[in-house]
């Protein structure tokens, strides 16, 4: 047999041996994750924005599982907070003061200054920025969560975070908060004829 064939066979056998060894080790030393953390993470919006004070949604889910409050996710809003509270069996609370006091903002790219580097596209966790290399980029404001992660990587500083103004499309009407007075109907007397 040639030395080349022997080397190939030997390396194949070594790769097979170490593959089986790694597979066995992966099964033997598998670390089971906390299933509640996985459920909490599935509820969170996965923007990885850090507005909750944690570096991403997974660390915040782990903190909630360890007893942290469920009202720290501004992009998720009240609906996410209520789902988290029901899963954890705690009373829903209003969003924390920081989340409520923040005016919703969206990214705005000054397109005449954009060099098309795509760094903001790569940084956006929700794919709210569209564009291509060496072409200008723009933000889909309906999809932007205002996480601010696209501002820092921009080399020409052409991204601003602008507050979203109230208009008919995004106004919070609070229809369930309008006071309604129920009037009981009194029975009418039958007409005598």
From Swiss-Prot:
UniProt-annotated location(s): Cell inner membrane
Ranges of residues in domain 4Fe-4S ferredoxin-type: 105-134, 136-164
Gene3D superfamilies (UniProt xref): 3.30.70.20, Electron transport complex subunit B, putative Fe-S cluster
The keyword Protein transport is annotated on this UniProt entry: no
Top-level taxon of the source organism: Bacteria
Ranges in a coiled coil: none
Chief subcellular location: membrane
Record Pfam families: Fer4_21, FeS
Binding residue positions for [4Fe-4S] cluster 1: 49, 52, 57, 73
UniProt-annotated stretches for the region Hydrophobic: 1-26
GO molecular function: 4 iron, 4 sulfur cluster binding; electron transfer activity; metal ion binding
GO biological process, one term: electron transport chain
Residues annotated to bind [4Fe-4S] cluster 3: 124, 144, 147, 150
Subunit structure: The complex is composed of six subunits: RnfA, RnfB, RnfC, RnfD, RnfE and RnfG.
HAMAP family: RsxB_RnfB (MF_00463)
The protein's name in its UniProt record: Ion-translocating oxidoreductase complex subunit B
Organism: Shewanella sp. (strain MR-4)
Classification lineage: Bacteria, Pseudomonadati, Pseudomonadota, Gammaproteobacteria, Alteromonadales
């Amino acid at each position: 047999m040639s030395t080349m064939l022997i080397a190939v066979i030997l390396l194949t056998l070594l790769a097979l041996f170490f593959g089986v060894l790694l597979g066995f080790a992966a099964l033997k030393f598998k670390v089971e994750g906390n299933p509640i953390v996985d459920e909490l993470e599935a509820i969170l919006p996965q923007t990885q924005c850090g507005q909750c004070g944690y570096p991403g949604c997974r660390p915040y889910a782990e903190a909630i599982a360890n007893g942290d409050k469920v009202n720290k996710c501004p992009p998720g809003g009240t609906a996410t907070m209520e789902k988290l509270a029901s899963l954890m069996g705690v009373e829903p609370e209003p969003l924390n003061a920081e989340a409520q006091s923040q005016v919703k903002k969206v990214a705005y790219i000054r397109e005449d200054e954009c060099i098309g580097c795509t760094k903001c596209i790569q940084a956006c966790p929700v794919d709210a920025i569209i564009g291509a290399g060496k072409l200008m980029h723009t933000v889909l404001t309906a999809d932007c969560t205002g996480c601010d992660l696209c501002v820092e990587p921009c080399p020409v500083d052409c991204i601003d975070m602008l507050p979203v103004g109230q208009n008919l499309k995004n106004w919070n009407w609070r229809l369930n908060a309008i006071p309604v007075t129920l009037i009981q109907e009194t029975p009418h007397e039958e007409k005598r004829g």
